Amino acid sequence: MAKLILIGGVSRSGKSSLAQYLAQHLPHATHIDQDEFVLPAQQIPKINDRTDWETPESIDWQQLTAKVKESLNSYNYVLLEGIFAFQNEALNNRADLKVMLKLPKEEFLVKRRKEQRWGEEPEWFLEHVWKAHLIHCNPHQTAIDLTFKSIQPKEFSKIQDKIELLP
């Protein structure tokens, strides 16, 4: 039976890097990036003058869960990563392993300020991103199997080892 691995954490915590590494190193694995299931901006709530990507309402959950189910029928390992990785109870219940990547707030702010994907972001918005993470990172208080703080790529193989030991 295919294994579902959920990887959650705040923006810039290393979720995508970890999932990409695991997809390359685990046999017959696929990486699903939650960002690929964001709704069109006009359907997402706003905060001040900005699209609020930091709310679970920004995700097309129906399409995302359908993709996960389809992938579980096609791969040995399905790696779902995103800021809302633990938001969906059905996925939480199906998951074989839940990995949380944490960053101290100061490190998050430094990394996010360097991010230029959306241009320079105002400080109030960075604070909003952090607060939204605290609210939405694990709303169901799901038991997390592995937690890493400020993970480094050299530690990725430790997670791979744990995954390969799953029954």
Describe the predicted segments one by one.
Residues 2-5, 21, 25, 74, ...:
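NTP-dependent small-molecule kinase module
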Residues 10:
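P-loop (Walker A) phosphate-binding loop of NTP-binding proteins
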Residues 30, 39-82:
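Conserved nucleotide-sensing/catalytic segment adjacent to the nucleotide-binding pocket
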